[in-house]
Amino acid sequence: MLVQFMVKNVLSFKEETVLDMTAIKAYKEHECNLIDIGMKEKFLRVAAIYGANASGKSNLYMAMSLFQRIIMESLNNVGEGEKNAIDRYYVPFSFEKTEENSEFQIVEIYGGYEYKYGFEYNAECIVTEWMY
């Protein structure tokens, strides 16, 4: 189950941006929209992403897709002269030239355990990767 998705320095997201599926008590949540898995927090079944035109809604979806593609395709061997998945899917912040690395992180709950997986990368390589 998805708990959080974080993206930084990708597409239109310069700063760290987090989609968080943790229910908060500040809103009047309907119980039917919450998932209680016996942990401290409850989680949302669905989330609506809305905003003005050009506010990043589609880019959040694209960032999730880039994250998935990098993971899936980085295992494939590429032919000589072809771009690898890291180079092909490196799309840093679009509105200014930056040398900063891009970053993804996902937090999931599976089998009652919380897992965090993420990596920081640039056009050449994965700089750091973590899972705990």
List PLM regions with ranges.
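P-loop NTPase switch/coupling surface
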Residues: 1-132
